[in-house]
A protein has these predicted regions:
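Accessory RNA-recognition modules of RNA-modification enzymes
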Residues: 1-233
Length: 235
């Protein structure tokens, strides 16, 4: 059984305003309406409940959950999905506006393999991740690239993976649904020119029914075929 908030009678004093416009629809950051210190406290309580109360395990004193110095723009990898019809929020549906079948480049709605929320700004990965995603979508829409339909298994554009490293290197891998060399080259050449900070530009052709690409051979289109996530100290 699932539910959603209809109205607030009285908000908890612990409730915080989410900083992401997609919070509550995107499943990526489920606790953003709690201050970070409270998130850590609740997560420590979850560990205690699952091991001691549910698991009946005798435990010593549980140390508090360790927090991160960064709560935004800390991820080094994000995978985005193309869809020929973007997910409409409840507010958009209830508003009755004629939005049409706009495409999406973003994240899956939790529990739905064929529904994708169009993301305007994600707070998980540092620049230039957002700019690369938005420019990719703009170029594809303006140049008539077809977006993936997971049920009908149609559309050229399937996925895009962006990796950023503390070294400053950026890897972009675009997954296409067909080996359309002309359109592949046009998009990748555009990204290379628009984002010179991309040090590794790759693509994969995936004609399978699922999105896994681990069994497919990536093509290094420009730059290196790898990035280094960490500097190794000589000492």
């Amino acid at each position: 059984m699932e539910g959603f908030v209809v109205r607030y009678v009285k908000k908890s004093p612990l409730r915080a305003e989410a900083f992401c416009e997609h919070f509550g629809v995107c499943g990526g950051c489920k606790w953003q309406n709690l201050p970070y210190e409270e998130q850590l406290r609740f997560k420590t309580g979850q560990v205690r409940d699952q091991l001691a109360r549910i698991g009946k395990i005798a435990l010593p004193e549980i140390a508090p959950c360790l927090g991160s110095a960064r709560t935004q723009f800390y991820r080094n990898k994000l995978e985005f999905t193309f869809a020929d019809r973007r997910w409409l929020t409840r507010e958009e549906v209830e508003g009755g506006a004629d939005i049409g079948a706009a495409p999406a480049l973003g994240f899956h709605i939790p529990g739905m393999f064929d529904k994708v929320l169009d993301i305007r700004k994600c707070w998980l990965q540092p620049d230039p991740s957002n700019d690369i995603r938005m420019e990719t979508k703009r170029f594809c829409v303006e140049n008539g690239y077809t977006f993936h339909n997971a049920r009908e298994h149609t559309g050229l554009m399937r996925n895009m993976i962006v990796r950023t490293a503390s070294t400053g290197e950026v890897m972009v891998t675009v997954v296409f649904g067909a080996d359309d060399r002309e359109r592949i080259a046009a998009l990748l050449d555009h990204l290379a020119a628009a984002f010179p900070q991309i040090t590794s530009l790759c693509y994969v052709v995936n004609t399978k029914l699922n999105d896994s690409v681990g069994d497919l051979d990536p093509v290094c289109y420009k730059g290196k075929d790898h990035i280094c996530l960490l500097y190794t100290s000589p000492s």
